[in-house]
Amino acid sequence: MQKILNCHYLEGDSLHPQSNVDKMAAGHPLDDDDRWPWLRLIRNHLTEQAKEVYDLDVTSSNRAVVVTCSSLKKVYRDILREVPAELGTVIFVYLKGTHELLLQRIQGRVGHFMPPSMLQSQLDTLEEPDEKQEKTIIASIIPLPDVEAKIIVEDAVKRGYLPSTCL
């Protein structure tokens, strides 16, 4: 999506404190107390990026900010939504896949600190977002990432989340 929109991008995992990285690398799932400071860091970064692009033309795709992270619970997404309304609206994209496909993707990551054995703990924590209650696009991870990103952007434009100039 970042390539299509030519916008700011942050991989949320890059903001994990070392204690979280060490805990996950050892195969121990994070708990809420581990996640709160990390989620606030992501939200703060998102807010700062939104301030940087605020003065761009409202029809510019460059005005978007893309952040990837595992906001598994609604309360986690609520923290990320705390970007001031005048700076923009936080939209979530929930990438949905089978256990097998998710495991395959995790096993294919090179140099990531979270071992594949932790997938089940992530799925156990997951509260799937409701498109009717949260500004969320639910997308399949079956297509190749570049294909799925294009589908997501098209859906976001169709729903009015992004300007038509993003296509």
Model-derived segments and spans:
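Non-catalytic structural scaffold of enzyme domains
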Residues: S60-V67, R77, L102-L103, Q107, ...
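A glycine- and Lys/Arg-enriched "phosphate-lid" helix/loop adjacent to the NTP-binding pocket
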Residues: K23, H28, V83-P129
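Alpha-helical structural signal in soluble globular domains
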Residues: M1-I4, I79-P84, D155
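NTP-dependent small-molecule kinase module
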Residues: I4, G88, Q104-Q107, E127-L167
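Glycine-rich phosphate-binding loop used to anchor ATP phosphates in small-molecule kinases
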Residues: D33-L87, L95
